[in-house]
Regions:
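Basic, helix-initiating cap at the start of DNA-binding domains
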Residues: 1-40, 44-53, 70
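Short amphipathic alpha-helical elements of helix-turn-helix/winged-helix folds
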Residues: 32-36, 74, 103, 155
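Residue-level detection of the helix-turn-helix DNA-binding "recognition helix"
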Residues: 52, 66-67, 77
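Short hydrophobic/aromatic patch on the recognition helix
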Residues: 54-65
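Hydrophobic alpha-helical connector segments
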Residues: 70, 74, 81-108
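Amphipathic alpha-helical segments used for helix-helix packing
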Residues: 101-127
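Amphipathic C-terminal alpha-helical segment
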Residues: 106, 110, 146-169, 178-182
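Amphipathic alpha-helical packing segments from all-alpha helical-bundle domains
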Residues: 119-154
């Protein structure tokens, strides 16, 4: 009985500070990666530059990610999760689509990829059988319903390649959400 009482006095999560540090480090690495894509370009960016810009040691970077591709995958996961979060916080489906559209159209990393590395961008956008795309598709289906989500995702992919302005984002989001039956 005494042993179980001592367990109750232990902190709920003794690893919370380590987890928080891990998350901050990951955020710094992913933010640095996105900045480097925007300034240096995807192909020219190196793991050494990612470590330097994120202000972590190379060993720390490699403890988190084994290579540039794994950093890029984590960045894609993070960005799609961010877009889903934007959609979930929006007051309605039209606003959600509009906000996601503006984020995609104004993203500096996507802008740089369109100019410097369109082939990699096209490959990434066409890999819609990937688990990341499936998760994004499911989240969009919860927001819009399955038929509208298919249209909305294709519309958003188009903006990664051919961005639109904020006014177009609003009017086109209204058109998509206004469709009764496809």
């Amino acid at each position: 009985m005494r042993a179980s009482l001592s367990l109750l006095s232990m902190p709920l999560n003794k690893y919370a500070p380590q987890v928080a540090t891990h998350r901050r480090t990951q955020r710094a690495i992913l933010q640095a990666t996105k900045e480097l894509i925007a300034t240096t370009g995807l192909k020219k960016m190196s793991m050494i530059e990612i470590a330097d810009v994120s202000e972590v040691s190379r060993a720390t970077l490699y403890n988190h990610y084994r290579d540039k591709e794994s950093v890029l995958l984590a960045l894609c996961e993070s960005e799609l999760a961010r877009l889903v979060e934007i959609a979930q916080k929006a007051p309605d489906a039209t606003t959600a689509l509009e906000q996601i559209s503006v984020e995609i159209s104004q993203d500096k990393a996507l802008m740089a990829m369109r100019a410097q590395d369109p082939d990699s961008l096209t490959v990434a956008l066409s890999a819609q059988t990937d688990t990341l795309w499936k998760a994004f598709s499911i989240a969009m289906a919860h927001l819009l319903g399955s038929e509208k989500s298919e249209l909305a995702i294709r519309w958003l992919i188009g903006q990664a390649l051919h961005p639109i302005n904020a006014q177009q984002s609003r009017s086109q989001a209204e058109a998509i959400t206004g469709i009764a039956n496809l």
